[in-house]
């Protein structure tokens, strides 16, 4: 027999070769005409990419590095750049000659992340003295990001606290000492920093202050 038709291929797909019996031969079904035989090149298998390394919020747009990403084998889409800490969805679609390792050929979504940066917290004062003449004082809080500010007193009968924005107001209640602890919760882009404290001493002519 003689071989003809498409006998060589490069891309994945289906091809058709032909076989024709020579003059003294015929097919087992008694025919002598060329027969078509389909042959196939399967798609090559590739693994879905994953984020390589880690990203941390820095206030600027960032894009991840990818492990297993080959521009000749797949296309990248979806969300490929982000600024805020959080999770983002990129997409990868295999080219015409490739399939995923699970055999599928559709678009895959791959999650990548930007981590929160280390938080920071500072107070404009670490100690204060309150008297009958000066019954209140304030602490100005400086923090990175938008984490909620809270403050507590370990002796609310001596000094109470309230928070408004980034200002902590301390009010004298009675003679004694107290420690004010200021905390900042994790925010959108920053982790919670370590707490800071301010020591308070209340001096009064009597043990109790009438407000």
Question: What is each stretch, according to the model?
Answer:
Residues 1-211:
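Solvent-exposed beta-strand/loop surfaces, strongest in extracytoplasmic domains of secreted
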């Amino acid at each position: 027999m003689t071989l003809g038709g498409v006998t060589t291929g490069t891309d994945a797909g289906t091809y058709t070769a032909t076989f024709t019996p020579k003059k003294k031969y015929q097919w087992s079904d008694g025919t002598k005409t060329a027969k078509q035989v389909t042959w196939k090149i399967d798609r090559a298998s590739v693994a879905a990419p994953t984020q390589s390394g880690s990203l941390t919020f820095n206030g600027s747009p960032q894009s991840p590095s990818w492990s297993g990403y080959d521009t000749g084998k797949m296309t990248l889409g979806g969300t490929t750049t982000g600024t805020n800490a959080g999770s983002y969805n990129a997409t990868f679609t295999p080219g015409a000659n490739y399939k995923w390792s699970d055999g599928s050929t559709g678009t895959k979504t791959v999650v990548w992340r930007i981590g929160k940066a280390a938080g920071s917290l500072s107070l404009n004062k670490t100690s204060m003295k309150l008297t009958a003449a000066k019954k209140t004082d304030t602490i100005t809080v400086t923090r990175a990001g938008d984490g909620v500010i809270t403050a507590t007193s370990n002796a609310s009968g001596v000094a109470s606290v309230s928070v408004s924005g980034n200002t902590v107001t301390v009010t004298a209640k009675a003679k004694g000492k107290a420690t004010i602890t200021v905390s900042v919760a994790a925010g959108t882009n920053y982790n919670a920093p370590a707490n800071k404290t301010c020591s308070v001493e209340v001096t009064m002519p009597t043990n109790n202050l009438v407000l």
